[in-house]
């Protein structure tokens, strides 16, 4: 269907005592699609009626297909049926906002603990930027009797060794491990590996004449060992990736895992890579090719970047790769403005459907960023976004679209992320989510 009616709980309150009402949802959704807001994830809401036209400034935000029927009834109309619409609503972009409070705070909203409003089990009590933050139990929360923890403290520690020392001295209860520490702690009872549906890959900017050549892209895709990256460099449960949609993420109508069903679409074969490379150079009339590799500025990415550079330069004669490491925000800016040749990047799901990965690469899509375009791919994705009833047909369209992406060697997969952590056995019921918010502490407790 195209119409959804949500009944809100009447006992939900904001942390300042205001009730949470349907108007808060109307305001939040209109704000999200308003082009003046420039919401990074605004595209996720474009299936709501008129959202696209509002985003293009053809209609005003109050024309969005959302209505407060009364204080506790919220109605949503879509442009066309979206099979995964209810899954979308757990994404933070769809959360309500208190208009009066936001307008009082103006530009300061959300920048400090005391310029933010809450309606969940915890409130942000203290926030020392780049150092630490503290959650405290929210006394206004409708279900606070279920919340067992009084507070949750987070430390921002960039050096993993220092963070593990804090764990070993009982100063913290949970810590992530880097590759070199995994083997040391693997045998401990508090060691855990978490499967993460986030996939890292190389984006090829086709504005670069060399990367506009399919043989060159295929050569690069086939010339580096992914399993080595997952098992040796990362050593934390990460696995080499051979497609875009991760494994253990979504199952089709016949209960088959998407990744299993579509198989390995991007193979590593140095012999083949050399053939593609020579063919590409010949087509370009070039013997030497120089490419810049845009990378994150953390330790892990640095190792991966250097490894990929080494493999590519060794296996593809005449190639020179220069690595450019950038802080996260600056890297995003360069990607958004197309100022890169190859970019090492990652994507995690916004909702549990393969389209959350595949939708990225439609022509001129806000997450495409690399001038990739294939009309057949576009039409399969468009169809899959609108197909509500033919579940099997839709699944097959998504499988087909992913195959096209790799026939074109539009991107080159690197690894699917795993995480190794130490977590005290006294900690119970911290829930880890594959999409939406990462962790839920509502039901968590610490056993004495």
Positions of predicted regions on the chain:
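Ligand-site clamp/hinge motif
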Residues: 113, 139-184
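Structural transition elements
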Residues: 239-279, 300-303
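Ligand/substrate-recognition segments at binding pockets and active sites
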Residues: 129, 277-349, 419
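Surface-exposed binding/hinge segments that line
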Residues: 5-7, 20-26, 40-100
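Alpha-helical secondary-structure segments
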Residues: 21-28, 71-77, 120-121, 149-151, ...
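Long beta-strand-rich cores associated with HINT superfamily self-processing modules
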Residues: 421-448
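Gly/Pro-rich hinge or "lid" segments in bacterial periplasmic/extracellular proteins
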Residues: 48, 78-147, 151, 161
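Extracytoplasmic/peripheral linker and loop segments enriched in polar/acidic and small residues
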Residues: 266, 318-333, 359-425, 448
């Amino acid at each position: 269907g195209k119409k959804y009616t949500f009944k809100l709980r009447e006992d939900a309150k904001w942390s300042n005592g205001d009730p949470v009402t349907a108007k808060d949802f109307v305001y939040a959704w209109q704000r999200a699609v308003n082009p003046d807001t420039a919401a990074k994830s605004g595209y996720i809401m474009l299936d709501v009626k008129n959202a696209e036209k509002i985003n293009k400034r053809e209609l005003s935000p109050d024309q969005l297909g959302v209505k407060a029927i009364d204080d506790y009834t919220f109605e949503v109309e879509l442009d066309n049926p979206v099979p995964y619409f209810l899954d979308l609503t757990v994404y933070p972009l769809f959360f309500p906002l208190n208009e009066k409070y936001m307008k009082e705070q103006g530009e300061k909203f959300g920048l400090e603990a005391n310029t933010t409003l809450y309606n969940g089990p915890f409130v942000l009590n203290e926030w020392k930027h780049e150092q630490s933050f503290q959650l405290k139990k929210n006394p206004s929360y409708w279900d606070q009797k279920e919340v067992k923890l009084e507070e949750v403290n987070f430390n921002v520690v960039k050096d993993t060794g220092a963070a593990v020392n804090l764990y070993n001295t009982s100063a913290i209860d949970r810590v992530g491990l880097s590759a070199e520490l995994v083997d040391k702690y693997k045998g401990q009872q508090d060691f855990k590996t978490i499967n993460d549906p986030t996939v890292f890959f190389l984006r090829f900017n086709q504005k670069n004449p060399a990367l506009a050549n399919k043989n060159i892209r295929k050569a690069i895709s086939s010339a580096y060992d992914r399993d080595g990256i997952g098992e040796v460099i990362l050593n934390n449960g990460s696995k080499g990736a051979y497609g875009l949609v991760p494994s253990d993420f979504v199952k089709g109508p016949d209960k088959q895992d998407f990744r299993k069903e579509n198989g390995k679409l991007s193979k590593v074969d140095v012999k083949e890579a050399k053939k593609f490379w020579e063919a590409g150079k010949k087509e370009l009339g070039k013997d030497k090719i120089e490419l810049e590799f845009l990378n994150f500025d953390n330790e892990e990415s640095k190792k991966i970047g250097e490894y990929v550079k080494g493999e590519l330069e060794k296996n593809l004669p005449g190639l020179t790769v220069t690595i450019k490491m950038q802080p996260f925000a600056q890297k995003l800016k360069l990607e958004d403005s197309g100022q890169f040749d190859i970019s090492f990047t990652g994507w995690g799901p916004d909702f549990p459907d393969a389209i959350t990965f595949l939708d990225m690469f439609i022509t001129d899509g806000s997450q495409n960023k690399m001038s990739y375009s294939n009309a057949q791919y576009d039409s399969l994705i468009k169809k899959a976004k609108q197909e509500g009833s033919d579940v099997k047909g839709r699944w097959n369209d998504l499988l087909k679209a992913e195959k096209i992406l790799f026939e074109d060697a539009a991107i080159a997969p690197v690894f699917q992320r795993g995480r190794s952590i130490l977590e005290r056995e006294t900690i119970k019921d911290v829930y880890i989510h594959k999409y939406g918010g990462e962790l839920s502490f509502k039901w968590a407790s610490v056993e004495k």
